[in-house]
Swiss-Prot record:
Residues bound to Zn(2+): H114, H118, H124
Residues that span the membrane, as ranges: none
InterPro entries with a match to the protein in the record: MetalPrtase_cat_dom_sf_prd (IPR023091), YbeY (IPR002036), YbeY_CS (IPR020549)
Any one biological process term the GO annotation gives: rRNA processing
Known cofactor(s): Zn(2+)
Annotated family: Belongs to the endoribonuclease YbeY family.
Name of the molecule in the record: Endoribonuclease YbeY
Major location (coarse): cytoplasm
One term under GO cellular component: cytoplasm
Subcellular location: Cytoplasm
EC nos: 3.1.-.-
Bound cofactor: record note: Binds 1 zinc ion.
Class of enzymatic activity (EC top level): hydrolase
Source organism of this protein record: Yersinia pseudotuberculosis serotype O:3 (strain YPIII)
Amino acid sequence: MSQVILDLQIACADSQGLPTEGDFQRWLEAVLPLFQPVSEVTIRLVDEAESHDLNLTYRGKDKSTNVLSFPFEAPPEIELPLLGDLIICRQVVEKEAIEQEKALLAHWAHMVVHGSLHLLGYDHIDDDEAEEMELIEIEIMHGLGYPDPYISEKDPD
């Protein structure tokens, strides 16, 4: 039996129009039990200022970003289901969905799936890793009823 514990923190000045806690729970449950039966994740929804600050502090990038992943690494002698934190910037997600002509809810789901895979150790630094990660993301997104997140809705079939 799998269990996913979500700690949802809303730090946006305006919380209108955000996905529901149930949406975030469903998206996590589509990913995490595939890799770990019991897991706990914090998702913090932030505005651009906080995203920019964290991105500059931890990645040296002087801009806000869609999702930041902070994996938790327990000492080897301690077993905890805590995977880590996802920081998702509302304005960047909304802007990207418009620019890429994607459904907003689908883009939110993709950010959660993508960030969760980072917490589980997946990365896209080299082409092989990127391809493996993208294939997993596409499969999970399809399972959730969403289209391939790497093909924008404006792209021809």
